[in-house]
Amino acid sequence: MTQQYQELTEQLAALVDAEWPMVSNLANAAALLYERLDRLNWAGFYLTDNHVLWLGPFQGKTACVRIAEGKGVCGTALQTDSVQRVEDVHKFPGHIACDAASRSEIVLPIHKNGEVIGVLDIDSPEVGRFSAEDEEGLREVVRILERIIVCS
């Protein structure tokens, strides 16, 4: 993991706590990611309810509130339970353009008790912004969140 992500995950671990509400933890996580990672125009979370992703805490411009399973990059990550790292969202079949300035995107499923409970979604106005190193670092971000999230 790169030095940047090592520092970021250490900060995240200090900012979140299993005793706190999930929305508070996700809000601080979104703010930290948006502040510490460069060349982003959106960082946040969508949470699942009955095979639909609903907008959660985020940083950036206003966003799509509801995303159906299998639709767009986030819905595909939910449906396939896999990381989606998209170099150019305009070439992604069925891309949902919440912000026309977004050009690349990475989405990572978040699990609790073996189920996908949401996704971490990060957008950039730069084509090809997200590397394998970003994916590795963001997987660790998700692991930290999965350890402290308590679902009601």
PLM regions and their residue ranges:
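Intrinsically disordered, low-complexity terminal regulatory regions
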Residues: M1-P57, T62, E140, I144-S152
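Residues at secondary-structure transition points
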Residues: Q3, A68, G72, A101, ...
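Regulatory loop-to-helix N-cap segments in sensory/regulatory domains
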Residues: D123-V141, I148-S152
